Amino acid sequence: MPIRRLPPETVNRIAAGEVVERPASAIKELVDNAIDAGATRIEVEAHGGGLTRILVADDGCGLSPEELPVAIERHATSKLAPDADGLWDLLRIHTMGFRGEALPSIGSVARLQISSRAKGAKDAFSILVEGGQVGEVAPAAFPGPHGARIEVRDLFYATPARLKFMKSERAEALAITEEIKRQAMANESVGFSLDIDGRRVLRLPPEHPGPQGRLARLAAVLGREFQENALEIDQTRDGVRLSGFAGLPTYNRGNAAHQYLFVNGRPVRDRLLQGALRAAYADFLARDRHPTAALYVTLETTEVDVNVHPAKAEVRFRDPALVRGLIVGALRHALAGAGHRASTTVAAQALDSIRAQQSPFPGYQPQYQPGPSPAGFSAWREGGWTPPTQRPMDLPGLNEVSARVEPSYGGDLAGVVREAYAAAAFEDRPPTDYPGATAPFDPVDYPLGAARAQVHETYIVAQTRDGMVIVDQHAAHERLVYERMKGEMASGGVTRQTLLLPEVVDLDPAEAERVVARAEELAGLGLVLESFGPGAVLVRETPALLGKTDAAALVRDIADDLAENGQALALKERLEEVCSTMACHGSVRAGRRLNGAEMNALLREMEATPHSGQCNHGRPTYVELKLADIEKLFGRR
């Protein structure tokens, strides 16, 4: 078959397949043009999932009648210009668009009408393109002083085969909504409105430039919960700036759909950035949970290539390691600064669950019959009414409140705290001299309050200044042990304790081989072992932090970790996985009764330890209930 030159209409339709994949893609290109035109307000309408009709109106600089026919020519744009040497540099791009493909591509597969009034002009003009056929420029009505109105009807009518690959109208409408949300998050100083089939879906007024305006826009798009649980990010390294907001580890999702990344104001989906985000949270979330974030990378245009994807959805960095390191470092710095803070949604979900209960004591029946109605208070005083005899109530769980803390400990509390640390597997660590160590704990003095009770030998109940805190003792102590092990590992190695009698652990031969192959790494974590014949290892030393631990169970869990992740993870990540497993074994277990000093020692350590708001698997270590919320439960508010 001989080589042929394709006609312009076919070329444009091929280009449209790359640039205009679906209605949301067309809207993205039109919104990009509006932003480049300096618009402060952008209105978007879509009907029939965007296939029937799309309208994008803006108050930008507009187009003159001479520019209208040029705007729909392929590779014609106002966003690139030659430098002093006559060179067209594609690395110095400061606009959203630059290819000059969007309008001709859309016009080749749909009915496209552009109406515009240039800034300072008296008259408005329009041009119509149908399936690649260009009409004449003609005078037109235009509602605003300047700007453009671009209407797209019957998208893909000229390429019926493409229509077969479209999803349902609902799915296309959701994609359009998501696209406008991304554009709105990238441009907080621009007002956006979106109507789907005549129904207002979004209405976002312009916000002031800066972190507060950006956070207000993110709250309007992602919800107030994100605003309440977001950490501000603002770090710069070697000319690259990372700003934005990232959610607390306990404010996570089941997928990565709530991760928004922007490079020089451009929404992108970049694997490097997403991988960096995962790495930053790897220490705080389970593998099936994902963080929430809206991150903005700003750098010189010469350091990033945006001309690597037809729809400009991907970018390529000149120094990807620098960008990845900045993201990981900045996020971990912010997470460390959050201390023991946990997501507010944890308490909200708990309260919602309580409110949903129809009966607070299912299956419980009162064990007495009320007496006759009294004649009144005066009759009671005169002996005319005797209150009924009430038998003790047998409420489910009432007798399982396993420990109660008295308001005052008396004596040398510092000594009691030392014993608490020993009992809580902090034997080799001198206790912290907390303020007021020789006086009763006052809930006003501490963020996590003063312990009042232990429930079901699992949960610590503490009174705070304006509410109460419920702590999962195992999850909290697991994070404390983990953080200390990481600190010791970073400073030269985890302190070991020698077993009086070395313990032989039987394993599968393949498991034993994997564990022995990592013996040097494990020794750095305080676990010293060696081969003891086929399918067995001999444990000589264990981490001192773990106290008295089940060495066999620990080694078997480590063998499972290495089997699952040993080849896939880097050395540092492997060590952290093993650290996490060890910390789980060395933690205060659920079902263990703690005394008052032990509980308060755990609370004080949580307050002093970064990341203590969640365990190693991303679950919350405590739930805080404000007094106002408790009063609402009882109808006092």
Curated annotation (Swiss-Prot):
GO biological process assignments: mismatch repair
Assigned keywords, A-Z: DNA damage, DNA repair
Keyword Lipid biosynthesis appears in the UniProt entry: no
PROSITE patterns: DNA_MISMATCH_REPAIR_1
GO molecular function: ATP binding; ATP hydrolysis activity; ATP-dependent DNA damage sensor activity; mismatched DNA binding
Function: This protein is involved in the repair of mismatches in DNA. It is required for dam-dependent methyl-directed DNA mismatch repair. May act as a 'molecular matchmaker', a protein that promotes the formation of a stable complex between two or more DNA-binding proteins in an ATP-dependent manner without itself being part of a final effector complex.
PANTHER family per the UniProt record, alphabetical: DNA MISMATCH REPAIR PROTEIN MLH, PMS, MUTL (PTHR10073), DNA MISMATCH REPAIR PROTEIN MLH1 (PTHR10073:SF12)
Name of this chain's protein: DNA mismatch repair protein MutL
Gene that specifies this protein: mutL
